[in-house]
Amino acid sequence: MISRYLRWQVLGSFMGKLLFAERDGVQVLKLIGDVRVTLGPTISTFLTRLGESKTFKSIIIDLTETQGIDSTSLGLLAKISLTTQETFGTIPTIISPNEDITRILESMGFDKVFVILKELVTECGQLGELNTEIVSESKLRKQVLDAHRVLMSLNERNRGEFQDLVQALEHERVGEPAEQRDRVA
């Protein structure tokens, strides 16, 4: 299904980068390196495009080269799963050979919203590079807030873990001018 002919696009940052490939409705999102909040806008744009896809059949999130991943990025991945299930009626797959990362995924409840496998069956093709998206601080704050709300919705452990952060971010948003809050999608 996924072959060496897949077209890759790189969505990157200084610490980590995202690679994307699509073929015959199968979309692959590969996270490389240390994936942090700075990649949030890029993941959000991917999520928007995914929801608008007319050819979507399935998605694979490849963590084979992921060294670290923060909670904002995890929340956005969870949002990809929930959106995919809601919009297309399919459960995404995560490839995670790193036991430490797999343990984090399972503790966050990802085993309830993803199929988690240890290896990708075939290699994907040539890589091409794209720029990382830069967004305003208020938009980034909203993405962090939304990502953590999604994580909180997965299980009670997450709710307890991220409740203080979400409340702090909500409090910061209250202090923003209304036109700035309303502008943030």
Region locations from a protein language model:
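Residues immediately C-terminal
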Residues: 68
